[in-house]
């Protein structure tokens, strides 16, 4: 998933843009990438290629990273890595083992499974806090 972010951003009027205006608009906005599960694997390699071309995205978010299923590439130190405590598809220990040599912080959502049922608000809150430079709680039960 690729998105462009602008703070604050309004979708009002986007439908009115013609095809020629859109590329110019997105060139002016910072690039953010996010991947969930297999998408985190894909995102890691897209970021690697973009970085080699000096076009690295400003932000990378990896949720439920599929580190035990695929060889996920190393990522920038400021990557937001979020994983569920009770993920039965990708064990938390696999993500921690992948993150440890990179000295990445892994945000663990207590009680969350691989699909973060009833925990999506926690993902949102972690990302919003990180993007606004606010500290993230070590353990938050919602």
Predicted regions and their residues:
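Acidic catalytic loop of the alpha/beta-hydrolase fold
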Residues: 85-90, 114-115
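Short beta-strand immediately N-terminal to the catalytic nucleophile in serine-hydrolase-like folds
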Residues: 33-35, 63
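Short beta-strand/loop motif that positions the catalytic acidic residue
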Residues: 75, 80-83, 87
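Serine-hydrolase catalytic machinery in alpha/beta-hydrolase-like enzymes
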Residues: 1-30
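A conserved short beta-strand
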Residues: 53-67
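Gly/Ala-rich beta-loop-alpha elbow adjacent to hydrolase catalytic centers
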Residues: 35-43
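Short alpha-helix in the alpha/beta-hydrolase fold that links the catalytic acid
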Residues: 91-99
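Post-His helix in hydrolase/transferase enzymes
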Residues: 117-132
């Amino acid at each position: 998933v690729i998105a462009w972010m602008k703070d604050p951003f309004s979708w009002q009027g986007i439908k009115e843009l013609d095809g020629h205006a859109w590329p110019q608009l997105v060139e002016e906005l910072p690039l953010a990438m996010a991947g969930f599960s297999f998408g985190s694997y894909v995102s890691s390699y897209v970021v690697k290629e973009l970085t080699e071309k000096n076009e690295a995205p400003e932000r990378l978010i990896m949720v439920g990273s599929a580190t035990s299923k695929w060889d996920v590439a190393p990522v920038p130190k400021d990557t937001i890595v979020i994983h569920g405590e009770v993920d039965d598809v990708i064990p938390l220990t696999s993500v921690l083992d992948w993150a440890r040599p990179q000295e990445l912080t892994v945000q663990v959502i207590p009680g969350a499974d691989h699909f973060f049922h009833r925990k999506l608000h926690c993902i949102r809150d972690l990302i919003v806090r990180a993007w606004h430079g606010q500290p993230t709680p070590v353990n938050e039960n919602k």
